[in-house]
Amino acid sequence: MPATLLRIHPENPPHSRIQQAVDVLRKGGVIIYPTDTVYGIGCDVTNAKAVEKVCRIKGIHPDKANLSFICSDLSHISDYAHGITTATYKVIKKALPGPFTFLFEASPKAPRFGGVKRKTVGIRVPDNQIILQLVKELGNPIVSTSVREDENTLEEYVTDPDLIFEKYRLLVDLVIDGGFGGNTPSTIVDCTNDDFELIRQGAGDIEQYL
């Protein structure tokens, strides 16, 4: 069955439409949604079959997938990551919500994708009301990966929800149109060694928070 295209106002998302997207996730669906950077593909972190579907869409094996978790706030972080020092927490609290993915050591509670225990986990709290309200209503983080196929190629379709819908409508269950997205990914920062190591420079400047 083709996906549904759901238009949601980016500044004032109606609760009824957020709930519609949450219902899809709770049924094991895969959705595409806006963030503060590039549109993402994701599902409920607790649904293993949905995670496998996300990986199939991206052409990656679950145990090798670099999937991040989108959280609504910092309260989820301790559930999936450990070893976060007070100094590190102060920095990420200032930086989030924002265009960053922070890498931490995975806690024992972190889901196993493909039956393999994760060593690290990427945490995202995007500055986007649609996805923040969606995750809050769901009550679980969303496993997330970018709709971009090639990080080194400028792909026109990734910024336009209508073009994204045309490309993915037979692969996912729902595409949220929250307006035009960006084409620059999040900045990835490794926090596993009590330091802030820049892995990928993206839309966010971590230096201003250090």
Indicate where each model-derived feature is located:
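Active-site-adjacent structural elements in enzyme catalytic cores
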Residues: 1-210
